[in-house]
Amino acid sequence: MTATSAMNPADVPHVYPKNKWLIAAAVTFGTLMGTIDTSIVNVALPHLRGTLSASVEEITWVSTAYVVASVIVMPLTAWLGMRFGRKRIYLAGLVLFLIGSFFCGTARSLPTLVVFRILQGIGAGSLQPTEQAILRETFPPKEQGMAMGLYGFAIMLGPAVGPTLGGYIVDNYSWPWIFYINLPVGLIGLVMVSRVVHDPPYLERVKGGVDWWGMTFLV
């Protein structure tokens, strides 16, 4: 009689990749863009207000919609990563962010811009938690502090650089370019992540449901 049994994920040896810093750089691209976009729009709001004929209260939704969408998505990211794979979720978030960036630049009405800022926020909200998970799986425990330091640097650098970068772009070009600038950087990150990031073999796919009541109260 032949006995077969499924291997316990805990029994699978964890082999850390040799190109760990390349992986760290790849996933930091998206996180840096996402954090920059929390503040890059702020300096362009007066220009957007005039172009879109919006009031002061209305134009603030361009910033608020992005932040709210990001915050709502973050709690779902861990469940989605376990169900579909962290690499897929990261790539999907980056693609959504880039699509949202492109259509934000083409928007010619406030409702349209807010809708695509929400799409941007959904994509960005999945990047930060997924990067943390990828870094923890990529680096051994003794090096995770340095990896998280890189992550923290991106989180701090984005909001600091955003207003300066946004002001320069608006003064020298036009407001759509604060969104279009994401495209070449994001495409580089997309190619890098697709080539160097791989889910570990022990990652379990969970089939549990979502706490929809919890998500409702969060919203």
Regions found by a protein language model. Give the residues of each.
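Cytosolic juxtamembrane N-terminal segment immediately preceding the first transmembrane helix
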Residues: M1-I36, G50
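Residue-level signature of mid-helix packing/kink "hotspots" within the transmembrane helices
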Residues: S39, V67-P75, G125, P159-A160
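Extracellular/periplasmic helix-loop-helix junction of adjacent transmembrane segments
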Residues: A44-V73, L110-V115
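Helix-breaking motifs and short loop linkers at transmembrane-helix boundaries and internal kinks
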Residues: T51-S53, G85, T106-T112, P140, ...
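Conserved MFS/SLC helix-loop-helix module at the cytosolic interface between two early adjacent transmembrane helices
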Residues: I72-P111
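Cytoplasmic helix-loop-helix junction between adjacent transmembrane helices
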Residues: I118-F153
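Hydrophobic transmembrane-helix bundles of small-molecule transporters
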Residues: D171-V219
